[in-house]
């Protein structure tokens, strides 16, 4: 008799995706981050659902409702800090996942890669709207500054900002709609994840060598399920340690002050995972130029497949490209640090230099070095 997992209409889909899926035998731990992102999304949806049961999206009560969750709701503080630090874990896994794709040339699967970029934008939008909900000082001013950037769009900018705000400033209408969208977006993200996996399973996974692995495949279960479970345990242990020992490590102390439109914080900054893009935005003195640079800092990923000039797919056997890749990582760390510093000398000039190097490395240095490596292959 045929196994039910191979005949049942629903189980058949699960089976072909997670059990009998042929996977390359050489996948390293860098391939764990996709499944870790799935766990992060599940944790965020679950904790978010329970938080939404106690949260009120009204400017008069939002801040107090978060305080109420932490003080009066059973294990409310665990829910709140799991959700806040879960977002940080989400972005750590996201950036490592994208970095792995860049390093091993996974971007040559253009459909999967482009859906991934859409996912990145959707998760960033979700996180931004979520940061506004506690209605602390940094929530309010972060929302004001970031939404106000849209006013740089010629002709329709000002109308667009007022349309998003639902008035002439960030107020009750803004908070209510941000809560509605913050609740909705994770489910859109979950749907996009399905499409992401659909396209991935059309082509099969890449592997560290970048060489087709059709001749050397193993079943996903039990080999990679066990490996993924180990990843889950490590990540959930790290998240638990962060939540239980230093829950405010990655947060901003200003957000423990209720939102006050009459008092601007000394330094408005977003959460740490947006600081690199924020530094690029601030490094350009022109408002429209800054907004374009901000969007392009992420959108540049979409043209990476077109800039692939190497004869080899992966960077595994390309030492010069490896050096440039780690140089790019160092630039991103520098930008993240600069984004958290005040706008003054020498931080301004360091941010500008790092921003220029970020775009130059991706657009010019990497394609040129790849061409050079092609010539070295002929020696």
Swiss-Prot record:
Effect of residue 236 to P: In strain: Isolate FMNH 128676
Gene symbol of the encoding locus: MT-CYB
Coiled-coil region(s): none
Protein name as catalogued: Cytochrome b
GO cellular component: mitochondrial inner membrane; respiratory chain complex III
SUPFAM superfamilies recorded: a domain/subunit of cytochrome bc1 complex (Ubiquinol-cytochrome c reductase), Transmembrane di-heme cytochromes
CDD domains reported for this sequence: cytochrome_b_C, Cytochrome_b_N
Residues involved in heme b b562 binding: 83, 182
TM stretches of this protein: 33-53, 77-98, 113-133, 178-198, 226-246, 288-308, 320-340, 347-367
Note: Heme 1 (or BL or b562) is low-potential and absorbs at about 562 nm, and heme 2 (or BH or b566) is high-potential and absorbs at about 566 nm.
Subcellular location, record wording: Mitochondrion inner membrane
